[in-house]
Amino acid sequence: MANQPQQPDTELHNASHLMQYHDLIESIVAALDARDAYTASHSDRVADMVLVLAAALGLDEDETTRIHMAAHLHDIGKIAVPDSVLRKAGPLTRPEWEEMRRHPVTGYEILRKVDDFKEIAILVRHHHERWDGRGYPDGLSGHDIPPGSRVIAVADSIDAMMSSCLLYTSDAADEL
C-alpha cells in the first residue's frame, strides 16, 4: 500500500480556518477603531447586539456566525473616508455626506475579493438599506434587503441612538 498523505481532520481544519478569520477581523476592526473615536468599540457593540437579536429570531448557528462577522466589519468601508469627514464634529455638508454614504460599497468591494467573505460582503453592502427603500447604497426595500443586513441595521441603529444619548448625559443609560 502506497503512503498516502493524511487528510487533516476537516472539523479541526475548519475551526482553525475560522480562528484565522476571527483574528483577521479583530485586526481590521482595531485599525478602523484607531481612526475614529465614535467607531471605537461601535462594531463590537453592534456585533454583540446581533448575537442577541439572532437568538431572539431563532437563527441557526451558521447564519448567526455570518451575520456576527458582518456586524464586526459593517463599517470597514469607512477606512477610505477622509479623516476630515470621519472625525468632523459638526454636521456634514452634502459632499461630505455623499463621501460617508459610500462606505457600504467600499466595504463590499474590500470583502468580496475573499471567497469565504462574499456573503458577508453582501450583508455589509446593504446594512444602511431601509424597509421603505429610502436607504443606501442601492435603495433596496422590503424583502429585497438581505435578512442579515436588516439585523445589522437594527443593531447599528440601537447603538447609534444609545451612543448619541450618552454624549448628552451620563444618566441616559438609566433613562433607557
Whereabouts are the PLM-identified features?
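A short, hydrophobic C-terminal helix/tail in secreted or cell-surface proteins
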Residues: 171-176
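Short, low-complexity N-terminal regulatory "tails/caps" that precede and couple sensory modules
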Residues: 1-19
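Metal-dependent catalytic cores of enzymes that make or break cyclic nucleotides
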Residues: 12-13, 19-170
